[in-house]
């Protein structure tokens, strides 16, 4: 069976994303999914990036995945501002679209999947003349697309961003299939059978429950240093925790995605509070080791589409304390059994929940055991069978 070769043409799957040099959850699960699809022998898998520029992948990808980098730096150049940059942005957009269309024409895929939600990607794929099924993967809930507008103070910029987001949502709705991460997101789109819910999968699931008897006095959180993740709220929470439990520490591991603004704000908040037990770390590929050095996980996000970090932490036997934000936490955490859910953005309630978790050791251990068992359903073999059924149906 190992030498079996199908006598039919393999279905060609083309995946389009910005780059694979980030250490974020999207890149982590995508690298695994593409590798497993290619290794299955059922598909010819193509990964197309446009901003990799020779940088190494953050996560390993099978050699059986065909890789193409368009090397246009389109997204980076679109962030330039000023009168003289307008022409450069226009030229880069045209160059990018031509390069992508040439690439797709050469591959002639059966399925084209947009992984990143950039307007240029979406419009280029939608306008590209082909019989291929066009798929968009939404890693952010529908209403959450507007959440980032809250931090924009300039009315002109806010209105401009709102219009762009409206265009993105309209373009997404034109795709043949929309893949979301939770059933709540699926119902919010209200587009019938064209919307499919497929959750993220675990990269790794320990065969045995990790030993959680050693007390570390450490709480962990993992994610980008960005407004979405609510780390500013978490630092305010920790000011309250520090008064009751100064022997406990908070460790945040995150990437910057080229923007240090949010991280610098957090550093100022920590310095102003004079807390010595809050630590901001760079993102790490050894995140499971960090989970195992911690007692429980806290999520302070303003919104989440799923929360890959939640199931990762739970697979290590960590219970969760989280805001009950849209959309992910409630679809994963059973309140009182595998963790504690606090009202969205309620600093006081989240602090109370963290204190409860600290002060009730036996209950924390029990929740951790329940958490480990509950996320077995996200093992790769189960989630990949759902993906394969999806691709075979197209």
PLM feature spans:
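N-terminal strand-loop element at the rim of the active site
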Residues: 16-23, 36, 40-87, 188, ...
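A conserved mid-protein helix/loop that constitutes part of the nucleotide-sugar donor-binding site
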Residues: 24-32, 217, 226-240, 348
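Short, structured helix-loop element that forms part of the nucleotide-activated donor/catalytic region
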Residues: 54-60, 251-276, 363
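Short His-centered aromatic/hydrophobic patch
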Residues: 114-120, 138
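Donor nucleotide-sugar binding/catalytic pocket of nucleotide-sugar-dependent glycosyltransferases
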Residues: 158, 165-207
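Aromatic "clamp/platform" in nucleotide-sugar-dependent glycosyltransferases that forms part
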Residues: 283, 302
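Short hydrophobic beta-strand element within catalytic cores of glycosyltransferases
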Residues: 319-323
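Conserved acidic donor-binding segment of nucleotide-sugar-dependent glycosyltransferases
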Residues: 334-336, 340-347, 356-362, 376
């Amino acid at each position: 069976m190992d030498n079996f070769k199908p006598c039919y043409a393999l279905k060609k799957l083309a995946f389009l994303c910005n780059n694979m040099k980030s250490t974020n959850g999207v890149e982590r699960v995508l690298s695994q999914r593409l590798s497993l699809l290619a290794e299955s022998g059922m598909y010819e898998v193509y990964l197309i990036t446009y901003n990799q520029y020779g940088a190494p992948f953050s996560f390993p990808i099978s050699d059986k995945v065909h890789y193409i980098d368009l090397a246009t730096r389109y997204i980076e150049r679109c962030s330039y501002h000023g009168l003289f940059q307008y022409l450069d942005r226009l030229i880069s957009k045209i160059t990018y679209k031509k390069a992508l269309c040439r690439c797709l024409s050469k591959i002639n895929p059966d399925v084209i999947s947009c992984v990143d939600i950039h307007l240029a990607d979406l419009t280029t794929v939608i306008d590209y003349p082909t019989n291929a099924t066009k798929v968009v993967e939404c890693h952010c809930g529908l209403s959450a697309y507007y959440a980032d507008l809250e931090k924009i103070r300039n009315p002109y910029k806010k209105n401009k961003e709102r219009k762009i987001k409206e265009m993105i949502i309209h373009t997404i709705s034109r795709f043949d299939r929309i893949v979301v991460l939770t059933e709540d997101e699926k119902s919010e789109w209200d587009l019938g059978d064209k919307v499919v819910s497929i959750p993220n999968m675990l990269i790794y699931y320990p065969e045995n429950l990790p030993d959680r008897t050693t007390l570390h006095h450490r709480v962990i959180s993992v994610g980008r240093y960005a407004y979405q993740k609510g780390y500013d709220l978490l630092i305010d929470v920790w000011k309250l925790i520090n008064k009751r439990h100064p022997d406990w520490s908070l460790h945040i591991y995150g990437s910057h995605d080229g923007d240090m603004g949010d991280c610098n704000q957090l550093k100022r908040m920590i310095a102003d509070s004079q807390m010595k037990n809050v630590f901001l770390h760079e993102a790490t590929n050894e995140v499971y080791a960090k989970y195992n050095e911690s007692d429980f996980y806290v999520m302070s996000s303003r919104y989440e589409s799923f929360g890959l970090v939640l199931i990762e932490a739970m697979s290590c036997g960590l219970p969760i304390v989280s805001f009950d934000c849209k959309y992910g936490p409630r679809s994963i955490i059973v309140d009182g059994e595998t963790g504690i859910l606090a009202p969205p953005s309620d600093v006081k309630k989240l602090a109370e929940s963290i204190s409860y978790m600290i002060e009730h050791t036996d209950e924390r251990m029990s929740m951790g055991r329940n958490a480990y068992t509950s996320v077995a359903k996200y093992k790769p073999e189960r989630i990949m069978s759902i993906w394969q059924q999806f691709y075979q149906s197209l």
